[in-house]
A protein has these predicted regions:
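N-terminal auxiliary segments of SAM/dcSAM-dependent transferases
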Residues: 1-41
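Conserved SAM-binding loop and adjacent beta-strand
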Residues: 20, 35-42, 52-70, 74-75
């Protein structure tokens, strides 16, 4: 599969066609190989416009949904971000390009391992905490 072409098609047909107007955001997404975050058996879905189901009822949001979320955040370089339910890091990989501080909370040990691997391979640094939401109550 040609992931560069898939990424380009996703930007053109999903993001630009659906009110993602932040040029900086579009460029960041165009330059980042989202497929690198995905397990091998799911890489072919990395640019699809569907929710991808993972273990324990967890899921990966489509690129358009993630992009709308980040666009609405209007992040600045000195913002501090807390991401709960980081999954494999698809949203983290966008946010970390805007800010120097992101703390991530994830309850799935398997997703943490996938996330750590993709963070190190893509030269990201984030604080990652394994916990369950119940531990806060």
């Amino acid at each position: 599969m040609n992931f560069e072409q898939a990424r380009s098609n996703m930007v053109l047909n999903q993001l630009r066609a659906n009110r993602i107007r932040d040029i900086d955001l579009i460029e960041k997404i165009e330059d980042f190989p989202r497929e690198d975050l995905f397990p091998k058996d799911l890489k072919h879905l990395s640019y699809s416009d569907q929710i991808i189901t993972l273990e324990q009822g967890r899921f990966i949001l489509p690129p358009l949904t993630s992009s709308h979320l980040v666009q609405c955040l209007d992040l600045k370089s000195d913002d501090k971000v807390l991401e709960v339910g980081s999954g494999i890091g698809t949203i983290t990989s966008i946010i970390i390009q805007y800010t120097t501080s992101i703390d991530c909370i994830e309850s799935s040990e398997a997703l943490i391992e996938t996330f750590k691997k993709s963070l190190s391979e893509n030269l990201f640094q984030a604080n990652l905490l394994k916990t369950s939401i119940e531990s806060f109550f």
